[in-house]
């Protein structure tokens, strides 16, 4: 269910070219070394097929955490303070020149459809920290997706209750860790002097991602004890042998509690959606201020808003959360013997999802183009889940439609034959919705810090150099074959093997 982020890539950078440390001379060299590991890990992760990328996420997270220790030490040294807060030895870092670092945005809208947005050049260590922490939070969200993927695969045996509980609990913890990182960035963004170089690390986007991660974690708390998605998944699973499985009844109090939790998730998603739309509208308005300097495809990255797929995902998550709340209100009403109100709540949920009532309640007699299209889209989504590709881009909307349609068909049949209760309109029921109830609290993020022994060892002069001036680009390797020497040649002797102007003739 979490959003399928695409991790960014970055260019090579040498800290020694822009920073010098008098108290700990080896700090810039070590920071460059660990940043090179992050750059190489992100490059290798991007080149992997989608089915294999989940296995490298742990390496990405570990490399970023190792690099953050040195990056935060350099950041503390610029302010002439200790990286351990109020205690510990002080670091003195001098800024020699503005750093020139490039990052590829992963949430900004692209000027050319179907292509990646161009790289953004940053000249601030604060923006480097924002990109690094945002990448870490995105990697944690992707780890949560990888943990939840086995619960949605219908071509293998259904995981047991213990495996399901462990997967949801682990994914919830990862999402809350990501939310704490975004909360740390949101607090730190208040001290920024200039505008963000792109929409990915702007204060509005960071706050929106915090709300999004909190909404996803809240829905997972409901999903942990919600038996109906499991019933629908088992019904679609050909390998499931327990075909007579009956969904356990949810107590009335818990159904009402789950509904309020879903409403809280909907409120968080609505807040994230408004922040993203404000960011996109401000980005769109900024594109007209540049005059002739921002023509065609050469417009500035700061003038572009967020990716439309990301904004649509947040809106779908808001709709899905409200539809889940309507479903739990329906379960609460059905447990109380109010079948008519239960059916009305289900139809209110379909209205929130944008599904027309006539399509959800009509009899399945004969062939229908809409029915064929729906089955084809469901099979395509199942293949995405099996391959580990960009599944769940609809934020669980299709799954919730299946659950509501199953309950609507069951209760409508009971109401037509036995109860015969009046079904209220969705507008009447939606006006009675209570407020949401939060379950999770975002804990303060504790950035990693260098061990005092390691920090003391960097008082020694550096051994070697961190000059990455001739380092190849992370995505452009192999594109410029002219810069490489012939196979088997000794480094630095390329000109001796090349053909000069005087040797163009055969003799």
UniProtKB/Swiss-Prot annotation:
Residue span(s) of domain BRO1: 1-294
Recorded GO CC terms: plasma membrane
Superkingdom as given in the UniProt entry: Eukaryota
GO biological process, one term: cellular response to pH
Record region (Disordered): 437-507
Biased composition (Acidic residues): 464-478
Gene3D superfamilies listed in its UniProt record: alix/aip1 like domains
Transmembrane segments: none
Biased composition (Polar residues): 498-507
InterPro entries: BRO1_dom (IPR004328), BRO1_sf (IPR038499), pH-resp_palC (IPR037505)
Family (UniProt): Belongs to the palC family.
Function: Required for the proteolytic cleavage of the transcription factor RIM101 in response to alkaline ambient pH.
Protein name in UniProt: pH-response regulator protein palC
